[in-house]
């Protein structure tokens, strides 16, 4: 089997083939026959719709559970059987989350041979494919998230990412290739893959039925509740990681792709719901990093470590995690900032002579110059909190001192509002003009900008703000 390969469409079909490459006679004879078009490359019609469906998977994940639900109407649910079904649900569910996912798909920790055998067994009891098939497909999902090479891309629809990718046939050539050398060299993975059908039948149906049958005589109840229905709920929980975790919640670490964090998804999936974190830090054995977040898979792996069954638990440094969080917060702030009116950018303001500024002010235009920037306050005069007389006294003058403490040391909000009224820059060597000229000459000027190219104006860093407040007349 090639080291970098794409998953087959069906876990059972691949296992039935023994996991080996099959070279057909047609492949040995180049150009002997034209290539057959895969059914997924043809449109769905009334005549061929049934060919697009994976009937084996439909039987396993839809038809059999329906049979179980129907039988549950007549089969009484005993308390011991119910408790056993719940316990085995968690056992097989952790076989997927702690075993298939975090151990084999992401190598986020190492396990002793007994633990590997246990996880391979109970993971098989979840009836979600062999370790090799499952982990290979999941690696493709991470490598090609939200693209056509993602085997269960949410971009194809929420229903498709949940169950459609299983019940509809997929062209294996379109699924992204991944590195699986480590899986091919793991004897437990290889053994389970070769004997997968036996593992599924025994661990999925026979074992839970034996426990309830030999334990308290409820053979058929064990078959229906701890077997069929328990498999259905484990599968649906896992499918929620592919669908719900890419649709519901927040994106505190990155929003380039669809993965999201949400407590509801975590509750449904044994802690796999903090998916945005997981896609950013996939080799971390944790999905939840806060003490209050629900992640029983993480807690179980930690307990195994204390028992000597697991070791080399991988964790990203808190510093790197926090950097990602801060960068995403900054990105969200930039998005909000881009929607606000910060006034005409300084570099786009026209440079005007002082005499022109004075003349326009004398001719009835309410212009005020503060720190070399001209502001038109005509429409604001009547709303000025300090009264009309106060603001009128600064029209046509340099009101820098007046605005920054000479009369009143204006608030940060006042500086922000003032920035939306600026209309020009005074010529004459003032600081703002020097800054503006340097911009035109492409000289390096201290100016922090966000990802959209907008200048970031921090509180107290407005161009009209004088660092040291000027002493007021009363204080003098």
Curated annotation (Swiss-Prot):
One of its GO terms (cellular component) is endoplasmic reticulum membrane. It is a multi-pass membrane protein. Keywords: Electron transport, Fatty acid biosynthesis, Fatty acid metabolism, Heme, Iron, Lipid biosynthesis, Lipid metabolism, Membrane, Metal-binding, Oxidoreductase, Transmembrane, Transmembrane helix, Transport. Its main location: membrane. GO terms for biological process: unsaturated fatty acid biosynthetic process. Residues 1-35 are annotated as: Disordered. Expected to bind 2 Fe(2+) ions per subunit. Heme binds at residues 384, 410. The chain crosses the membrane at residues 55-75, 81-101, 111-131, 200-220. Stearoyl-CoA desaturase that utilizes O(2) and electrons from reduced cytochrome b5 to introduce the first double bond into saturated fatty acyl-CoA substrates. Has high specificity and catalyzes the insertion of a cis double bond at the delta-9 position into fatty acyl-CoA substrates including palmitoyl-CoA and stearoyl-CoA. Contributes to the biosynthesis of membrane phospholipids, cholesterol esters and triglycerides. This is Acyl-CoA desaturase.
């Amino acid at each position: 089997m090639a080291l970098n390969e794409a998953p087959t469409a069906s876990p059972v079909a691949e296992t039935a083939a023994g996991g080996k490459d099959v070279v057909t006679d047609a492949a040995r004879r180049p150009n002997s026959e034209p290539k057959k078009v895969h059914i997924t490359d043809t449109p769905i019609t009334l005549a061929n719709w049934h060919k697009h469906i994976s009937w084996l998977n439909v039987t396993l994940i839809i038809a059999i559970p329906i049979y179980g639900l129907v039988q549950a109407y007549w089969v009484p649910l005993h308390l011991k059987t119910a408790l056993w079904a719940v316990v085995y649900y968690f056992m097989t569910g952790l076989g997927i989350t702690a075993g298939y996912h975090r151990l084999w798909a992401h190598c986020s920790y190492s396990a002793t041979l007994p633990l590997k055998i246990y996880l391979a067994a109970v993971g098989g009891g979840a009836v979600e494919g062999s370790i090799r098939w499952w982990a290979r497909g999941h690696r493709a999902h991470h490598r090609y998230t939200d693209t056509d090479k993602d085997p269960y891309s949410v971009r194809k629809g929420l229903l498709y990412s949940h169950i459609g990718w299983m019940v509809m046939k997929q062209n294996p050539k379109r699924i992204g290739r991944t590195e699986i050398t480590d899986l091919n060299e793991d004897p437990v993975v290889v053994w389970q893959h070769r004997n997968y059908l036996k593992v599924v039948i025994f661990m999925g149906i026979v074992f839970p039925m034996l426990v309830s049958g030999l334990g308290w005589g409820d053979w058929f109840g064990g078959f229906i509740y701890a077997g069929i229905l328990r498999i259905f709920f484990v599968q649906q929980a896992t499918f929620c990681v592919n669908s719900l975790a890419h649709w519901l919640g927040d994106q505190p670490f990155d929003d380039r792709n669809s993965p999201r964090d949400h407590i509801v998804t975590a509750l449904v999936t044994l802690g796999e719901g903090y998916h945005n974190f997981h896609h950013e830090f996939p080799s971390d054995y944790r999905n939840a990093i806060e003490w209050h977040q629900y992640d029983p898979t993480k807690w179980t792996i930690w307990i195994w470590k204390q028992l000597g069954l697991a070791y080399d638990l991988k964790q990203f440094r808190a510093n790197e995690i926090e950097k990602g969080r801060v960068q995403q917060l900054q990105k969200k702030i930039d998005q909000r900032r881009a929607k606000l009116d910060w006034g005409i950018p300084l570099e786009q303001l026209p440079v005007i002579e002082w005499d022109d500024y004075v003349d326009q002010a004398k001719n009835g235009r309410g212009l005020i110059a503060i720190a070399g920037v001209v502001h038109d306050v005509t429409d604001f005069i009547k709303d000025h909190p300090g009264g009309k007389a106060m603001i009128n006294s600064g029209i046509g003058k340099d009101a820098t001192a007046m605005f920054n403490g000479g009369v009143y040391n204006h608030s940060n909000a006042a500086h922000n509002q003032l920035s939306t009224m600026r209309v020009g820059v005074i010529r004459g060597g003032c600081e703002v003009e020097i800054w503006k000229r340097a911009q035109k000459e492409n000289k390096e000027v201290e100016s922090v900008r966000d990802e959209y190219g907008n200048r970031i104006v921090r509180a107290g860093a407005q161009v009209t703000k004088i660092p040291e407040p000027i002493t007021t007349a009363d204080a003098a």
